[in-house]
């Protein structure tokens, strides 16, 4: 009886997930380019286009931070596993550029599995287990981009940075929300709208919140491919650490 109910619940959740992803792909994603374009049109109309040049440097800084983080992750993985992390990372350019183009961890997963299968130091069974798991749980590149853009947009609009307590609380909650955010373009940013309004913009007028969300979504969507690529590439480092851990526990 219990097993039958469990299977019924699992089937319901799978159908619900399929329904939500269908809505995202069929409704939200097609209108996203129009939303981004309308926000840039509004920025141009208000004469704020000159300020947008600042975000070019912000995006470049975000990409640099993501590459630094990828390097750190593979160094940590090499130290923990006592194997050369380069023997995983060097096979990942294909997955990186696929993620850069698709802006979707889910769409890039088959290519990531192909890439890590070429590595001689990660077992196939471990990779098949670890990569699908981490593609949903581990969104470090997206969180780096989200935190950086929140600070940059806030400074552009209000002339100061959010207080440290609010940013730390937002960072913790963003990491938690990242676990459940959909693996679609702009998924983390859209998932963080609620905590943006309740933590970072709690003292701002509703009109300012709407404008903030619009600018955030426009800029985030443009650079989202780099965050997704960072997510996918660092999953290889986590897979290497997972392989070592399972070997130590005699589980693989």
Each model region followed by its residue ranges:
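Helix-loop-helix junctions within the multi-pass membrane cores of secondary transporters/permeases
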Residues: 100-178, 249-252
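Small-residue-enriched core segments of transmembrane alpha-helices in multipass membrane transport
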Residues: 20, 56-73, 91-99, 167-181, ...
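Transmembrane alpha-helical segments and their short flanking loops
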Residues: 148-252
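Membrane-water interface of transmembrane alpha-helices in multipass transporters/channels
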Residues: 49-56, 81, 85-93, 160-169, ...
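Juxtamembrane helix-boundary/capping and inter-helix hinge elements in multi-pass membrane proteins
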Residues: 2-7, 15, 46, 81-86, ...
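Transmembrane alpha-helical segments of multi-pass membrane transport proteins and ion-pumping complexes
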Residues: 30-34, 62, 66-75, 79, ...
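Hydrophobic alpha-helical segments of integral membrane proteins
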Residues: 9-27, 52-59, 88-92, 96, ...
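Signature of multi-pass transmembrane helix bundles
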Residues: 1-88, 251-252
